[in-house]
UniProtKB/Swiss-Prot annotation:
Methyltransferase among keywords: yes
Chain coiled-coil ranges: none
Gene Ontology CC annotation, any one: cytosol
Top enzyme class: transferase
Record carries keyword Methyltransferase: yes
Protein task: Specifically methylates the ribose of guanosine 2251 in 23S rRNA.
Residues noted as binding S-adenosyl-L-methionine in the record, renumbered to the chain: G197, I217, L226
Protein name: 23S rRNA (guanosine-2'-O-)-methyltransferase RlmB
Alphabetized GO MF terms: RNA binding; rRNA (guanosine-2'-O-)-methyltransferase activity
Taxonomy of the source species: Bacteria, Pseudomonadati, Pseudomonadota, Gammaproteobacteria, Vibrionales
Superkingdom as given in the UniProt entry: Bacteria
Entry keywords, A to Z: Cytoplasm, Methyltransferase, rRNA processing, S-adenosyl-L-methionine, Transferase
Subcellular location: Cytoplasm
Annotated HAMAP family: 23SrRNA_methyltr_B
Length: 247
């Protein structure tokens, strides 16, 4: 079975709490024994995971210079979800909120969107197989544990998946600069999917045409667009605000 590295306290802790069987071995900074790390090391030992102490330089090299917070783990690659898993996930939510990312290829942006999605109670993130950042250590680290919690579904044909979900009552709201009304005028209270495109390019034509509604985020300054992770946070939490107000 293929394996991968994860690094950082949040990412390692999230996998340890939910899928401890994925751990192969762990590497920790030699001599570090603080209150944040020791409980994780104790749990790893209980699970029978081999722990190696390493110098900072060795850990830095393994993490390719990224901020590992003194811990790296080699784990089995998690099961990749696809369109066949969507129905089971939706069945767990009375009024599902989904996030669709069309063409978000930067791992930092994907990780930040996962973190937003977890905070907003998103049921799943849907991405196209051929136009999305891979799930890797960078995504997991930026997501601060959300990558191990929020289902990430990779689909072969995004527009077809959207149409299938529309038939099940999901309303698709896409973000586009050319939209005629803004997010604060849109109704975001029912079963909903918010669709975000890539920075610069936006959504692909077929994705945009498949959306039920197009909205924009009002911009008062000189910049014309926002980072996709910032924009997704704004949209998701406007949906959260409306849903809480409707209760």
């Amino acid at each position: 079975m293929s394996n991968e590295f994860i690094y950082g306290i949040h990412a390692v802790k999230a996998v340890l709490e939910r899928e401890p069987e994925r751990f192969i071995e762990a590497y920790v900074l030699k001599g570090r024994q603080d209150d944040r790390l020791m409980p994780i090391l104790n749990d790893l030992q209980v699970c029978g995971v081999s722990i190696q102490q390493m110098t900072r330089k060795t850990l830095d090299d393994k993490a390719h210079g990224a901020n590992h917070q003194g811990i790296i783990a080699r784990v089995k690659v998690a099961k990749q979800l696809n369109e066949n898993d969507i129905d089971d996930i939706l069945a767990q939510h009375e009024t599902p909120l989904l996030l669709v990312l069309d063409g978000v290829t930067d791992p930092h942006n994907l990780g930040a969107c996962l973190r937003n999605a977890d905070a907003a109670g998103v049921a799943a993130i849907i991405v196209p197989k051929d136009r999305s950042a891979p799930m890797n250590a960078t995504v997991s680290k930026v997501a601060c544990g959300a990558a191990e919690v929020v289902p990430l579904i990779r689909v072969t044909n995004l527009a077809r998946t959207m149409r299938t979900l529309q038939e099940q009552g999901i309303w698709f709201v896409g973000t586009a600069g050319e939209a005629t009304h803004d997010i604060y005028q849109a109704k975001l209270t029912g079963p909903l999917a918010i669709v975000m495109g890539a920075e610069g390019d936006g959504m692909r034509r077929l994705t945009r045409e498949t959306c039920d509604d197009l909205i924009k985020i009002p911009m008062a300054g000189s910049v014309s667009s926002l980072n996709v992770s910032v924009a997704s946070g704004i949209c998701l939490f406007e949906a959260v605000r409306q849903r809480l107000a409707a209760k």
